[in-house]
Structures are given as structure tokens and as C-alpha cells.
């Protein structure tokens, strides 16, 4: 069957996945500090989204951040989720932007500021691509932290998640707090 023979609703899922792939390319080609590329990008769908949601719900009991419940429910409205993360690598500038005077004085586990900035620029490029193609997104720290817990982006010390959807109304805004996992 040709795509022109399909209803828009039938073709929408394929379109969203294609946009997500373009978002991944935009993240990859985004400028990087010192030209060093240590970001990782991945796409999850279907059962992986459910697994991510379940992990977010489980994390609430550990840390008490109730907004994880809302976000865990919210990502189930996504057709896919783009994950963008960075490995930890000192860039050797001794700039102090991370809070330490020198790179050698930086405590292990504290990301180099350039690593964090690179993730932010990659996220901006990915979301701009989605906006240009009229697809809805929202950057989620909560889902990114759960993806990091699942180790889906190997060795990444900071991960953000971007759920992606194309529907009549953006499901990622005007969200109501969710008090319990089953409500």
C-alpha cells in the first residue's frame, strides 16, 4: 500500500520515528566543546518506554520526588523517546566552571562543565529539529535519570530524555500532578 493511500493517522507513527531519527542526527552534529564528541544518543519505543516508566515509578519510593509519577505516566503518551547523554571526560581547560580550580582538582563524578554544556547544545539542536517538523517534545530530567539507571547509554554520567509525540494537543504540557502511581 502506498503512503498516499493511508490516512494521516496511520502514517503519523512512521513520521514521528523519522523525526526522532533526525533529532538524533541533529544532536550528533551539534557543536561540541573543543570539538570532542563524547555524547551518546539513542531511541526507545514501545516496551522500552513502558520499562522506563516503571523504573521512574520505582525511583519515587527511593527519593520521594513525586513529579516522577506524573512524568512516568506522561511518557506513556510518547510514540518514542530520544535519549541524549554524555560520558565524563575532563577537557583540560582548568577553567573552574565546574567549581574546582583545576581539572586535576576536580572530584571524580563531577562532570566537566563542557560535558554538561555539550549535552545542552545537543538537546537544543534535537528539539529545534522537532519543532521545525511540527512534532511535540519535552526535555525530562526525570526520565533521563531513569534511563541512566537502566544503563541504556553505556558509561554516560548525565542523561536527559526527550519524549516525542504528534497529536492534536501536546501531551507534555498542561500536566497535572500525580499523587499515586495507581491514580
Language-model-detected regions and their locations in the chain:
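Acidic, surface-exposed loops and disordered segments
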Residues: 4-183
Amino acid at each position: 500500500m502506498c503512503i498516499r493511500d493511508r490516512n494521516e493517522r496511520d502514517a503519523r507513527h512512521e513520521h514521528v520515528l523519522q523525526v526522532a531519527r533526525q533529532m538524533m542526527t541533529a544532536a550528533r552534529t551539534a557543536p561540541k566543546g573543543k570539538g570532542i564528541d563524547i555524547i551518546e544518543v539513542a531511541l526507545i519505543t514501545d516496551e522500552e518506554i513502558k520499562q522506563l516508566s516503571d523504573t521512574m515509578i520505582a525511583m519515587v519510593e527511593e527519593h520521594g520526588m513525586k513529579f516522577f509519577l506524573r512524568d512516568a505516566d506522561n511518557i506513556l503518551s510518547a510514540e518514542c523517546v530520544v535519549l541524549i547523554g554524555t560520558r565524563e571526560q575532563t577537557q583540560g581547560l582548568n577553567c573552574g566552571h565546574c567549581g574546582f580550580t583545576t581539572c586535576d582538582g576536580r572530584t571524580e563524578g563531577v562532570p566537566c562543565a563542557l560535558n554538561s554544556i555539550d549535552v545542552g547544545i545537543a538537546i537544543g539542536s534535537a528539539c529545534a529539529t522537532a519543532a521545525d517538523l511540527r512534532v511535540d517534545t519535552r526535555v525530562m530530567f526525570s526520565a533521563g535519570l531513569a534511563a541512566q539507571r537502566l544503563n541504556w547509554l553505556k558509561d554516560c554520567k548525565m542523561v536527559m530524555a526527550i519524549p516525542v509525540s504528534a497529536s492534536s494537543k501536546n501531551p507534555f504540557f498542561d500536566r497535572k500532578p500525580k499523587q499515586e502511581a495507581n491514580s
